[in-house]
Amino acid sequence: MKTRVMYMECKSTGQATIGRVSFSKTGSTLRYRSLEFISLKGSGFKANYLETGSGEQYWISGPRKDGQDRLYASSVPVEIDEDVREEYLREIRGLL
């Protein structure tokens, strides 16, 4: 299964995480930890995936090099999973 470091933001709570996501063969389903997301195929409002367990809408994309991933400014910090922290800072942000 193909994996990639991605930015994930829950649209209802604003909670945001950078972590490793795995893709189905078609790319229409993503998995992160125990969560499964299906593509909204353009039907969501400022969201592109639906978490199948809760029905919550998420914005999931590749993290930006400048670190400005949020759609709207927020005081809630973006969490970075420990298993991808070094890769994110070195390869995506170019900080290490």
Put a short name on every predicted segment:
Residues 1-20, 29, 35-96:
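Mixed-charge, low-complexity intrinsically disordered regions
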